[in-house]
A protein has these predicted regions:
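Cleft-lining beta-strand/loop regions that shape enzyme active-site pockets
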Residues: 2-19, 24-222, 232, 421
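Polar, glycine-rich mid-to-C-terminal structural blocks
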Residues: 186, 198-199, 203-205, 209-272, ...
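Conserved functional hotspot residues or short segments at active or partner-binding sites
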Residues: 240-452
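Intrinsically disordered, low-complexity regions enriched in small/polar residues
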Residues: 9, 79, 92, 98, ...
Length: 452
């Protein structure tokens, strides 16, 4: 088992373990040939206890003994924030855990001290968490006394209302909130409320649509657990963000998306039209770049270790590298990676080949295959695997270079370095920064469209 990514401030990193270190034994028991699950189980233990790991470091080939003290693992909910070009501040917030809003507040204050002119708040892939943390973040940007959230259930004691309770930090700083289909729950309360008050431009793709209040882990007999839904969320405009409805049928309840014909129209504070029943629709839709198939399969450590081994060798050959803001894998380094992939005999599933097989099957069924057989054969030859050619295709090459760079930055500078480096090629962030640099366009988006 090989260590992939030690996390900053966690036991592995504090003990000096690095990406690529091979675990040979734990407390004297050999781990050679053991499964990842087996090794992981032996790494776990009570916080405060210690274990002794014997590892082999690829950069030197030497075997080392390392003492590691276990502790409760808490992944960072604010893995990176920092100033970008042209006075644009960036905060990556990935989970609404207890006290996380305080870190967002501190980050915002720090960025303002550095001269921030506009903020990008990144809630992509933030699945939510504590509603109280969402309310605290909204208190930072919305005037005191404003309505933020209602919870409405079938019984009165499930109902509640929340308003801003303190003076805000800032009510004028231009803000763009980045969202995607994995932005859910408390993240949608934050982004939706900022949208309802015209306090920020929401950018990206439509959010998940989780508008239910739930009590998790209600204990049941025989070690059973129940997640109980008690109410729905309603944000200031009056809309509910829940995307699924549960329809009663003869076979029980069936979950289905709320059809557009049954959604309702609401208005923001400035009079812009917004709708319920499907998460938060961004003010500007910006789709991310798609990941090519070849890049997807090369990056999966469960199918191939080519990329991982290349990165381990790269780290061994480069004790230091450029900062995350400046680092880019060179074409010469990529060529070495390409040659390694070609020599390995690596193959992957091409979507075009799969579609061609489906088309052939359909043509046979409809009786047209024999007439078109020469064309099918010619197309099959054209689409035949050519790994070297696939790796040289400019878009594939760029995306693979970006993946390797992000992994390397995590090894040299931890997760924050990887996130900072990824902003170099982040289409959604680039559009957010561009918009914040254009005050007229930004303000126009927050005004209702003139009716014809």
């Amino acid at each position: 088992v090989i260590i992939n990514e030690p996390y900053e401030g966690m036991p592995a990193a504090e003990a000096g373990l690095k990406k690529g270190d091979m675990i040979l034994s734990i407390d004297g028991e050999s781990m050679v040939g053991k499964t990842t699950a087996y090794v992981s189980d032996h790494l776990r233990g009570e916080p405060g206890t210690t274990m002794v790991l014997k590892i082999q470091r690829p950069s030197t080939g030497k075997k080392m003994t390392v003492k590691v003290q276990r502790k409760a693992i808490q992944m960072p909910y604010l893995p990176y924030y920092g100033m970008q070009k042209d006075g644009i501040g960036y905060i990556n917030y990935n989970q609404y855990l207890e006290n996380s809003a305080k870190d967002v507040r501190r980050a915002f204050i720090d960025l303002k001290k550095q001269g921030m002119k506009g903020l990008v708040l990144d809630l992509r892939n933030n699945g939510g968490g504590s509603v109280q943390e969402a309310l605290q973040i909204l208190n930072m940007f919305i005037p005191k006394g404003r309505h933020l959230l209602s919870m409405k259930g079938k019984v009165k004691n499930a109902n509640s209302n929340y308003n801003t309770t303190v003076e805000p930090l800032d009510t004028v700083m231009p803000i763009v909130v980045l969202v995607n289909e994995a932005t859910a729950s408390a993240s949608e309360i934050t982004s939706g409320t900022l949208q309802d008050y015209d306090r920020a431009v929401i950018m990206g793709t439509r959010t998940y649509g989780k508008g239910l209040v739930q009590i998790p882990n209600v204990s049941l007999p025989y070690n059973g657990k129940l997640k109980l839904t008690t109410a729905k969320y309603y944000i200031p405009s009056g809309r509910c963000i829940q995307a699924l409805r549960y329809k009663h049928t003869d076979n029980g309840y069936v979950a289905e998306n709320v059809p557009d014909s049954l959604t309702h129209e609401f208005r923001t504070a400035a009079g812009r039209i917004v709708r319920d029943g499907g998460g938060i629709k961004p003010d500007i839709e910006v789709k991310p770049d798609s990941l090519p198939n070849i890049a997807f399969y090369l990056s999966r450590v469960d199918t191939t270790d080519i990329m991982l081994n290349y990165e381990i060798d790269y780290i061994a050959a480069h004790p230091t590298v450029a900062s995350p803001k400046d680092f880019e894998l060179s074409d010469a380094d990529y060529e070495q990676f390409k040659q390694r992939v070609v020599k390995s005999g690596f193959t992957y599933d091409q979507v075009s080949e799969k579609i061609l097989k489906e088309l052939e099957s359909l043509a046979r069924f409809e009786g047209y295959y024999d007439d078109a057989k020469p064309e099918f054969e010619a197309l099959r030859q054209k689409l035949k695997h050519n790994i070297a050619k696939d790796l040289d295709y400019p878009y594939n090459k760029q995306k693979i270079k970006e993946l390797i760079a992000a992994d390397l930055m995590a090894a040299y500078y931890f997760e924050k370095g990887s996130l900072e480096n990824s902003l170099r090629n982040d289409k959604q962030f680039a559009e957010a920064a561009r918009l914040l640099g254009n005050p007229t366009e930004y303000q126009k988006l927050l005004q209702p469209k003139k009716e014809k």
